[in-house]
Amino acid sequence: DAVHDRNVAHDVHVTFDVAALLAEQPTPETERIRNARLDQKPYWNLERCRIGETRKVPVELIVNGEPVATKKIEADGSTQSLEFDVDVKESSWLVVRILPSVHTNPVFVEVSGKPIRASRRSAEWCRKAVDVCWNAKQGQIREFDKPAAEAAYQEAREIYERIIAESAGE
């Protein structure tokens, strides 16, 4: 829809084109890929997404890190147009993915001029990551630069603590 009042939640109509290509039938090599752990190469191979013995893969709409809708497509290499409708009640980010192989960049949906505060758990992870990063890097920072670096890291801590307090979901 071309015009929306940004101050109210809306049903968002998501449209996109997607293509995926798999061999018609699994082979010993594709089975090896499918059965490999996710931390083993080839990491992002589409074969990991094949549904059973079919040539289909799941295409998911993700809102704030959570799958909200799934459709299956035939992975025959053709471009297919898909649509999802989702109710967006608060500012959110949306991506489309074929797990665990590919995903789009996020699309940001703003509601009522509010920032995205989707996941307290994610914000807590980021807050802890600031300390991990500081502990790993502080010994490599020149003494002259250390006060400014400490101030920047402290500001990051405070920002993430505020985001944690403002977060709506788990």
PLM features: what roles do these ranges have?
Residues 1-170:
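C-terminal functional module detector
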